[in-house]
């Protein structure tokens, strides 16, 4: 009984990961479940949203540069 049980357990231990890798590497499954879900959670950015974000980053960068420049001019 013990040897048969160990053989069964080892079969399960080896079969489960192989089956999971086989299922996960199916192109159709990946497209249906992963890519589609990703698009639902994080939709593609709109051009005007991206442009606003870039403008905001540029304003913040300029403010930091001006602050550093003022600090450098006032320093020793």
UniProtKB/Swiss-Prot annotation:
Principal subcellular localisation of the protein: membrane
Gene Ontology BP term (one): mitochondrial cytochrome c oxidase assembly
Membrane topology category: Single-pass membrane protein
Gene Ontology CC terms, in alphabetical order: mitochondrial inner membrane
Listed transmembrane segments: 7-24
Transmembrane among keywords: yes
Record-linked InterPro entries: Pet100
Cell location: Membrane; Mitochondrion; Mitochondrion inner membrane
Domain of life, per lineage: Eukaryota
Pfam families: Pet100
Keywords assigned: Membrane, Mitochondrion, Mitochondrion inner membrane, Transit peptide, Transmembrane, Transmembrane helix
A GO term for molecular function: unfolded protein binding
Protein role: Plays a role in mitochondrial complex IV assembly.
Family statement drawn from the similarity comment of this UniProt entry: Belongs to the PET100 family.
Assembly, per entry: Interacts with COX7A2.
PANTHER family attached to this UniProt entry: PROTEIN PET100 HOMOLOG, MITOCHONDRIAL
Name of the protein described by the UniProt record: Protein PET100 homolog, mitochondrial
Native source species: Bos taurus (Bovine)
Gene label: PET100
